[in-house]
Design a protein with these regions (language model features):
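Single conserved hydrophobic/aromatic residue that forms the stacking wall/gate
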Residues: 1-8, 12
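Exposed loop/turn and edge beta-strand positions of beta-sandwich/beta-sheet ligand-binding modules
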Residues: 2, 156, 232
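Generic structural "secondary-structure junction" signal
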Residues: 4, 26, 42, 46, ...
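Structural signal for interior beta-strand "rungs" in well-ordered beta-sheet cores
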Residues: 83, 87-225, 238
């Protein structure tokens, strides 16, 4: 109450509104490198501390959450508001205040958390999730049941980033600030976090935390070099890399077939 009475609530509310309108972002690519905007992430985290809990009653249930976020991004919108925003939003898609959705995006029944940035022409498919502060580029397809993880804390940590023209297969998860490079195709049922080994099948090189642009990635296993009888461990395998022209002309299924 003290913070709200001193006007800090209005400051944070403006920050959330700027996130909502795409004027600011939790992370951004600068000179070819992704950086986290710590002050934006801190504003989100502090807003949870200064706003009280509130109740919202509906026709079949009630909800209890922070007052400034209890109602979603599009609460009270008219048809004209939706037309101006320019994205399609299917019923039963919780999209939180403080998330940005670009024009011509399609939100099937999905979940979009605070701070998420979804660029133009991207589809978040049925029961897929866009976590807090994640950045999803233009013309991506986040397939049914898949998730793009959120990262709020620590403030300096990069959120999970999906660059332009990426296909993320059904029931997959990319989390913990992993970066998926532009034009990549990730097959169904792949899971990638910061500790996941990413193996280039052609070179044998192992890396972590980043999928290079225009990679085609499938789940795989990696044997223990020192013990042939030990259980193999999960990894993500880059089976090929293609150029932009090939990616644009080749179907996802053809790219994944070897």
């Amino acid at each position: 109450d003290f913070c709200l009475s001193r006007g800090l609530g209005d400051v944070y509310k403006r920050q959330i509104t700027d996130l909502d309108n795409g004027k600011v972002r939790a992370a951004e690519k600068v000179n070819g490198q992704w950086i986290a905007h710590q002050h934006i992430k801190k504003a989100i985290m502090l807003s949870f501390r200064i706003y009280p809990m509130e109740n919202l009653n509906g026709p079949y249930s009630s909800w209890y959450d922070k007052a400034h976020l209890l109602k979603g991004k599009t609460a009270g919108w008219s048809k004209e508001d939706h037309e101006k925003a320019g994205f399609r939003m299917v019923p039963n898609s919780p999209v939180r205040k403080g998330s940005f959705v670009g024009k011509n995006a399609v939100l099937m029944p999905c979940y979009v958390n605070i701070g998420a940035y979804i660029d133009e022409g991207t589809m978040i498919d049925t029961f897929a999730r866009a976590g807090s502060c994640c950045q999803i580029g233009k013309n991506c397809h986040i397939s049914a049941g898949s998730g793009v993880g959120g990262v709020l804390e620590p403030a300096q940590a990069l959120p999970t980033i999906i660059e332009d023209n990426v296909f993320l297969g059904a029931m997959s998860e990319v989390v913990e600030g992993v970066i998926v490079g532009e034009g990549s195709v990730l097959s169904m049922g792949i899971y990638i976090g910061q500790s996941t080994k990413i193996v280039d099948r052609k070179s044998g090189k192992i890396s972590y935390g980043k999928i290079p642009p225009y990679s085609v990635v499938v789940p795989g296993t990696l044997p223990d070099k020192n013990n042939s009888s030990a259980a193999s461990l999960y990894c993500a395998v880059i089976i090929k890399q293609v150029d932009e022209k090939t990616r644009s002309k080749t179907s996802v299924n053809d790219l994944l077939r070897e």
